[in-house]
Amino acid sequence: MKGALELQHRVSAHPDSRCWYVAWNPAGTTLATCGGDRAIRIWGKEGDSWECKCVLSDGHQRTVRKVAWSPCGKYLASASFDATTCIWKKTDEDFECLTVLEGHENEVKCVAWAPSGSLLATCSRDKSVWIWEVDEEDEYECLSVVNSHTQDVKHVVWHPTQELLASASYDNKICIYKEEDDDWECRATLEGHESTVWSLTFDPEGRRLASCSDDRTVKIWKESTTGDGSSDESWKCICTLSGFHGRTIYDIAWCRLTGALATACGDDGVRVFSEDPTADPEQPIFALSAHVPKAHNQDVNCVSWNPKEAGLLATCSDNGEFAIWKYNSA
C-alpha cells in the first residue's frame, strides 16, 4: 500500500444510537448526519473542531436512514424507516420541514437528487423506486413508480450528468432506469453479485458504475453499446475486487476529484483503492492504496468524499460517531 488515511477528527454524533449516514453539502463546508435516534444533525467546523449547528428531530417517527443535499445546497432530503421522506429547506442557520413525501408502504432506505435538482428518487423495502419532480414553487409530484426489483431496494444513485438512475437491491441485482415517453423504465439489469447489493457510485465522468455487496466484492461496470440500434442500455462487469474485505461492504464512494474509490465495511475497516492509469480501460486494475482496519469500533456504514477538498473523507459507524480522514495517495 502506497497511500495512507490519517485521522483528523472523531465526533460522537448520535450517542447511544447508530450513525447511518454522513453527507457533505455541495460547498464541502457542512456535514449532515442521521441515525437511529430519529434525528438529523447539521455540523460545521469551528476552529479545529466540528460543532453541531442544529438538530432536526421533529420530522420522523423512526430511524433516519439517509440524508442527501440538493445540488444547490439549499435543501436536504431525509429518508426514514417511518416510510416517509422529508424535504428540509435551509433558512439562515436553521432548517424547516417544507414537505413530507408519502407513498412507500415500508421503510424508505435511500433518497437521491438528480444533478439538475429538479428530480428526486426514493427507494424502499416495499421493492419500489419512486421518481419525484420538484417545481419552482417547491411542489413535489410523483412522476413514476417502478417495480423492477423482487426484494428490498437498498440504494439509488443518479448519473453525474445525465438523467439516468441506478438502484441496488437485496435481490442481488442492479437496475438502470431512463425516462421513455414520460415514464421511467428499467433499461438494463446488471447481474453478477451473489448476495445483496448495498451501494452504488458512478465514476466522475459517469462512464462506469461501482457496486459493493454482501458477497464481499466490489464490481466495476461499464456501459457497452448493443450495436443493434435498440434503446436498451447494456452494461458489463469489467473488474471485480475480491479478497480485500472480511465482511459485508456497506458503502462505496468514488472521489470526483482524485478518482480514488473508498469502501465502508462490516469488519470495521475503511479502505481506499487507486486505479492504475496505465491499464487498459476495458480491463481496469485497482490496487489497495490505504486501509484502516479499525477505523471505528463497530460496522462502518458510510464513506463520503468532500466535493471540494481532494482526499478529505467522512465515515460513520454503528457506534454513533463520524470521523474525518485525510487520504494521501503516495
Swiss-Prot record:
UniProt protein name: Probable cytosolic iron-sulfur protein assembly protein ciao1
Keyword Iron-sulfur: no
UniProt subunit comment: Component of the CIA complex.
InterPro entries, A to Z: CIAO1/Cia1, WD40/YVTN_repeat-like_dom_sf, WD40_repeat_CS, WD40_repeat_dom_sf, WD40_rpt
Record-annotated disulphide pairs: none
PROSITE patterns: WD_REPEATS_1, WD_REPEATS_2, WD_REPEATS_REGION
Keyword Repeat listed: yes
Biological processes, Gene Ontology terms: iron-sulfur cluster assembly; protein maturation
